Swiss-Prot record:
It comes from Calycanthus floridus var. glaucus. Gene3D superfamilies: 30s Ribosomal Protein S19, Chain A (3.30.860.10). This is Small ribosomal subunit protein uS19c. The lineage of its organism: Eukaryota, Viridiplantae, Streptophyta, Embryophyta, Tracheophyta. Its main location: plastid. InterPro entries: Ribosomal_uS19, Ribosomal_uS19_bac-type, Ribosomal_uS19_CS, Ribosomal_uS19_SF. One of its GO terms (cellular component) is mitochondrial small ribosomal subunit.
Length: 92
Protein backbone atom coordinates (compact mmCIF):
# COMPACT_ATOMS: atom_id res chain seq x y z
CA UNK A 1 0.00 0.00 0.00
CA UNK A 2 1.10 3.55 -0.57
CA UNK A 3 1.58 6.07 2.20
CA UNK A 4 -1.50 8.03 3.29
CA UNK A 5 -1.82 11.52 1.84
CA UNK A 6 -2.67 12.80 5.32
CA UNK A 7 0.89 12.07 6.40
CA UNK A 8 3.99 13.90 5.22
CA UNK A 9 6.65 12.02 3.24
CA UNK A 10 9.26 10.31 5.41
CA UNK A 11 12.68 11.95 5.47
CA UNK A 12 15.23 11.09 8.16
CA UNK A 13 15.75 14.03 10.51
CA UNK A 14 19.54 13.96 10.27
CA UNK A 15 19.40 13.96 6.47
CA UNK A 16 16.91 16.83 6.38
CA UNK A 17 19.09 18.87 8.75
CA UNK A 18 22.19 18.34 6.57
CA UNK A 19 20.34 19.40 3.42
CA UNK A 20 18.85 22.49 5.04
CA UNK A 21 22.29 23.49 6.37
CA UNK A 22 23.83 23.15 2.90
CA UNK A 23 20.96 25.11 1.33
CA UNK A 24 21.51 27.95 3.83
CA UNK A 25 25.23 28.13 3.00
CA UNK A 26 24.50 27.50 -0.72
CA UNK A 27 27.19 24.83 -0.87
CA UNK A 28 27.22 21.60 -2.85
CA UNK A 29 29.00 18.68 -1.24
CA UNK A 30 28.34 14.97 -1.10
CA UNK A 31 26.02 13.90 1.71
CA UNK A 32 26.68 10.37 3.00
CA UNK A 33 23.61 8.51 4.27
CA UNK A 34 22.42 5.05 5.22
CA UNK A 35 18.76 6.12 5.10
CA UNK A 36 17.47 4.31 2.02
CA UNK A 37 13.84 4.70 3.17
CA UNK A 38 13.87 8.51 2.96
CA UNK A 39 11.69 10.08 0.27
CA UNK A 40 13.28 12.56 -2.13
CA UNK A 41 11.79 16.03 -1.61
CA UNK A 42 12.22 19.19 -3.74
CA UNK A 43 14.80 20.72 -1.37
CA UNK A 44 17.19 17.87 -2.26
CA UNK A 45 17.33 18.76 -5.98
CA UNK A 46 20.85 19.56 -7.13
CA UNK A 47 22.62 17.78 -4.28
CA UNK A 48 24.75 14.65 -4.55
CA UNK A 49 23.78 12.05 -1.98
CA UNK A 50 25.92 8.95 -1.38
CA UNK A 51 23.45 6.14 -0.63
CA UNK A 52 24.59 2.96 1.12
CA UNK A 53 23.88 -0.24 -0.82
CA UNK A 54 25.02 -2.63 1.90
CA UNK A 55 28.67 -2.61 0.88
CA UNK A 56 29.60 0.92 -0.20
CA UNK A 57 28.11 4.35 -0.76
CA UNK A 58 26.99 5.14 -4.31
CA UNK A 59 26.93 8.87 -5.18
CA UNK A 60 23.62 9.83 -6.81
CA UNK A 61 22.92 13.32 -8.22
CA UNK A 62 19.31 14.28 -7.40
CA UNK A 63 17.23 15.67 -10.28
CA UNK A 64 13.65 16.93 -10.42
CA UNK A 65 12.39 13.68 -11.95
CA UNK A 66 13.42 11.76 -8.81
CA UNK A 67 11.11 13.71 -6.46
CA UNK A 68 8.66 11.39 -4.69
CA UNK A 69 10.82 8.29 -5.03
CA UNK A 70 12.82 6.66 -2.23
CA UNK A 71 16.61 7.01 -2.06
CA UNK A 72 17.03 3.22 -1.98
CA UNK A 73 15.50 2.88 -5.46
CA UNK A 74 18.63 4.38 -6.99
CA UNK A 75 21.21 2.23 -5.17
CA UNK A 76 20.70 -1.45 -6.07
CA UNK A 77 21.75 -3.89 -3.36
CA UNK A 78 22.15 -7.01 -5.48
CA UNK A 79 24.48 -7.62 -8.41
CA UNK A 80 23.33 -10.11 -11.02
CA UNK A 81 26.24 -12.43 -11.87
CA UNK A 82 24.40 -14.34 -14.61
CA UNK A 83 22.70 -17.70 -14.75
CA UNK A 84 24.70 -20.87 -14.24
CA UNK A 85 25.96 -22.37 -17.46
CA UNK A 86 24.52 -25.75 -18.37
CA UNK A 87 27.21 -28.38 -18.64
CA UNK A 88 26.23 -30.61 -21.57
CA UNK A 89 29.16 -33.00 -21.05
CA UNK A 90 27.97 -34.16 -17.62
CA UNK A 91 24.56 -35.20 -18.99
CA UNK A 92 25.97 -37.84 -21.33
Amino acid sequence: MTRSLKKNPFVANHLLAKIEKLNMREEKETIVTWSRASTIIPTMIGHTIAIHNGKEHLPIFITDRMVGHKLGEFAPTLTFRGHARTDTRSRR
